[in-house]
Amino acid sequence: MARHRDSRSPSPTGSHHSSRRNRRDDNGRRDRDRRDDVRGQRRSRSPDRRERDRDMNRRRDRSVGRLNDDYHRSGRRERSRDRRSYADRERSPDRRRRRSRERDYRDRRDDSYDDRARRRREDSTDSWSRSRGDETRGQTPRSDAGAKVNDAPKVSTPAVQTEEQKKAERLAKLEAWKKKMAEDKERKEKELAAGGTRKLLDAIDQKANGSPSLTSPNSPTTPATPATPGDLAPPTNYAGKFDPKAIAKKAVASSSSAHTLGKDLPLKELSKASATLTSTVKGLQADKKPTAFSSTSKVSALPKTRGNLSVFGLGAKVTDNEKTSQKRALDFDEDEGSRKKLEKLPSLPMANTEEDDAALANGVEEQDDDDDADLEAAGTEEEAAAAARAAAEKREERLQEAEAQPHTNGDVQMEDAPQPDSTAMDEDEEIDPLDAFMEEMGDPFSLPKNNATFIKDNIKSQPQEPEPLFGDDDVDLKALDADPDEILAIANKARKKKDIPTINYSALDLPPFRKNFYTEPTELAEMTEAEIADLRLELDGIKVAGKDVPKPVQKWSQCGLDVKSLDVITKLGYERPTSIQMQAIPAIMSGRDVIGVAKTGSGKTIAFLLPMFRHIRDQRPLKGSDGPIGLIMTPTRELATQIHKECKPFLKAMGLRAVCAYGGAIIKDQIADLKRGAEIIVCTPGRMIELLAANSGRVTNLQRVTYVVLDEADRMFDMGFEPQVMKVFNNIRPNRQTILFSATMPRIMDALAKKTLQSPVEIVVGGRSVVAPEITQIVEVREEKEKFHRLLELLGELYNTDEDARTLIFVDRQEKADDLLKDLMRKGYPCMSIHGGKDQVDRDSTIDDFKAGVVPIMIATSVAARGLDVKQLKLVVNFDAPNHLEDYVHRAGRTGRAGNTGTAVTFITEEQEQYSVGIAKALEQSGQEVPDRLNEMRKSYKDKVKSGAKKESSGFGGKGLERFDAEREATKARERKIHKIGGDDDEEEKEEKDDDVLLKAASVVQPAASTAPPKLLGVPKGIDLDGDIKVHRTEPAATTGSKLDKVTSAIDAINARLNKTGQLRSGVPIDNKGPDAGAFHATLEINDFPQKARWAVTNRTNVAKILEATGTSITTKGSFYPAGKEVQADPKLYILVEGDTEVVVTNAMRELMRLLKEGTMAAADAEGRAPVGGRYTVT
């Protein structure tokens, strides 16, 4: 068992225990002493003398840890005498607490001590005697037997020196070493000047690959250090860095002569050891007997047996002397190397041995100037590997030409060694992460360095230092620069808008499919036209349009459905079809395109699902990559989820599969479901396009789609989905069957239906946009502050009578929904909110909880107004009035479904009289009385429309997705400008295109009620922000009392009349008579720009910057007139720019126009992010 590193009892002076440097604090102290000492000073191998009381962690001699030590005790030792000699020593309290070493020695033990103890047993006593022979201390070392003392020669210096003497000696040796280094540097400079660049390279090759002889390769006349005892370095000189820990690690190699160098040491330290092999071996041999010196020159030579190679190209079988020298020399720099990972390993200077060893052991501080450059040249791992390969190729060429045996910084390089050996040091060197990071942070603006290309011209940047690797100040950067065209192509490809691959169905041989599955029953065929008309009138007044419309059925058995569908219908408890189902199912089963309009909750979903199941089961099963057969598109995610749930009972019975695909959910799950195969897909248009465009159209396709349904079709086109819906329709086979269903169908939809349907049958049940008669409608005109109190009254009345009832409250903005949620929660009503700004998972869970009765009240925007079917929903409150008739019908239609009754209460304020028209019309069509106050509001609004003060709008008609596309492109253009990299010519060429995109996107902020729509949307008419800037010269004022006074007054009168239009014309005099009036002026009208754009060119910060840069005078004049307001005598808001020269005025105008562009884009971006207001953003 190895003895612990902290021993309590003193070891005999001179024994190898006292010379062991096994204390970590000793290592640190030795490093500090070595840093302060001069080069070449003697080193002491024993710990410094110190007071025993200060050693708080000493262990007792009686510990069993010393049983395996090589501390050989004499059998005649009198232990009592030893105790008496130390009995009077003063002990610290801590020592009493820790008297036994066996309690905690394991947690403080270093496992390496076991190996060192084993190595010491294998080493001979003579080896230790030789190492200690030249010890500089005046001590009497104990022999291995413990009884004899080595007769070491007396040293010239006293054993104990004063601090002044030590300091003087260190300074003297430091000066000698500096003088020697200066002479050596001067000699190298002279040789460089005499030999030129070619000779310098040859010298590098000689130095990198030459034999480690004691003579300098560049100065053959300089005598080498003689191999005689008399001329050896005196014993008092410092013999290089000596680390007993490293010697103990290497001693184990002597147990087997067949061990290779790579197996004796960890791979991390082998690279360091190879670099210091030659110099440290010479330092050791200088202190040994003279017979060992002659072998030093052969240590780095090529081994005799070339075939047996170690990992560093060294012979695995060498002589004993060579092994001993290598083992002791390999890891002498262990401490310093572990502390400074990035320090450059020193090469062999062209000087005598003793001074070289001293400088190496003490860590030369005055290194060459290009050390930092070499460290920076490390680069990435790929660059370092490329550099090493290039260096290896050059070294191979030099090996073939060189006559002497090569060596490189102590590494033996063999001609037949594998090539990676030459890069072992670079690849195995571990770089400290902090040092590497600080190295990278040295110059953040420096250009990237390339280590893969070495050019001979680089020699000029480092002409004074013969190093194999040079600085990279002049390195060619072309190897790192990618082709700008390729980068632009990649960026364009990444930014390319995903599109659906177009399919030319005319060139495809598509298999035919069957549409008509309906056979008219006998009892219906026998009915006359009068009887059919009476039947339709009884069924909620069904109205049909089209040719050869089938007669309405009266029972499920007459619909032509298969047995499995009828069984599921029976289990679900559907006794008889509803009015829309009686007329729509026969028409769809006949293979006709159908437009169905029916009141909310009338069973429209089942009306198109049942024929779809029969349509799909008639076709062949899906194979391989076949896409779906039935496609159902909805405007909202909630409606898609609800339709998918209604499909599930039928899917299980018929063995079909359906996928619900909508935005906000994880697309990879939906792709996985589609790849497994699905006959039906229920989706929103946006997600459908994403799926079709994903993976270049290989995820799914529409080639097998023959049955298409658009549920709530009017709302889908109202929300702007028409481009997407038409894009999907264009990729479906033309002879498909198409079904359109909705509770409301404005007349504007007729033109769209004609484009997508072929000879459709139109079915209207109960009117086009009518609230169900089972719903009680209440409209109240109230102030905004009275709404919440009235809501609390309604909730209290409802839940006093029916605790299980549900309430749905509609608001117009997302922020309003959250605010109302907070207010109701404070009043004790459990509720939740749902709107488009919430995550899809939250929206789904909220609806599920509302249906299950977890929360009885839900606050929602119009996102929940379509298709939401909740049982026990007794009350619907329109807290904010709906903006058009169809929205009101769908909101009210959430209650009173499937024959149940319900109540819809609507709040409307005096300021919302434009909404009174649609609400009053809905009340009239459903047969309910219109309140007098509401009727007055409607009349007042119609009168204002007739007078032109107001403009009537139906609230229908989406803007399409071009608006969002333009905003998206404008945002990307702004980001490209902000993050543009300097020197990229392509970016400069694209600036004009980006500006066009900005202006195009700015079109969305143009007021809708503008009387004169501009040619370029977003920019007022007559203003070209990209055009030429017109600067006018200021005319001198007319002289008072001139004959032209009358003419001037007449001109003023004309100008006064012209100013009434609010337009700035070239003939209008500019009010620039103040002290800042300049010789030139220009005007820029900003009245019709968005608010953010106007603010950008009028706020103090921006104006001050322009004034400071151009020296002009900028004044805001005129008055702001909102859109539609009549312009008075004062002109519209404009900016007057005045300056002494035309150039400064032009520059100021250009900067103002730039600010206008940015402000316009900011307004467009803000509107695009939150089109309905609120603090939520859907990304």
UniProtKB/Swiss-Prot annotation:
Which superkingdom?
A: Eukaryota
Q: Name one Pfam family in it.
A: KH_12
Q: Any idea which GO molecular function terms this record carries?
A: ATP binding; ATP hydrolysis activity; nucleic acid binding; RNA helicase activity
Q: Where is this region: Disordered?
A: 1-167, 180-241, 250-269, 318-427, 941-994
Q: Boundaries of each Helicase ATP-binding domain copy?
A: 585-763
Q: What class of enzyme is it?
A: hydrolase
According to UniProt, the reaction catalysed is: ATP + H2O = ADP + phosphate + H(+)
Motif DEAD box mapped to chain: 711-714
Which segment of this protein is annotated as the motif Q motif? 554-582
Q: Where does ATP bind?
A: A598, K599, T600, G601, S602, G603, K604, T605
The record ties this protein, via SUPFAM superfamilies, to: P-loop containing nucleoside triphosphate hydrolases
Location in the cell reads: Nucleus
EC number of the protein: 3.6.4.13
Q: Which InterPro entries match?
A: DEAD/DEAH_box_helicase_dom, Helicase_ATP-bd, Helicase_C-like, P-loop_NTPase, PRP5/DDX46/KHDC4_KH, RNA-helicase_DEAD-box_CS, RNA_helicase_DEAD_Q_motif
Q: Which PROSITE patterns match?
A: DEAD_ATP_HELICASE, HELICASE_ATP_BIND_1, HELICASE_CTER, Q_MOTIF
**UniProt domain comment:** The Q motif is unique to and characteristic of the DEAD box family of RNA helicases and controls ATP binding and hydrolysis.
Its biological purpose is as follows:
ATP-dependent RNA helicase involved spliceosome assembly and in nuclear splicing. Catalyzes an ATP-dependent conformational change of U2 snRNP. Bridges U1 and U2 snRNPs and enables stable U2 snRNP association with intron RNA.
Query: What's the protein name?
Result: Pre-mRNA-processing ATP-dependent RNA helicase prp5
Q: Which organism is it from?
A: Botryotinia fuckeliana (strain B05.10)
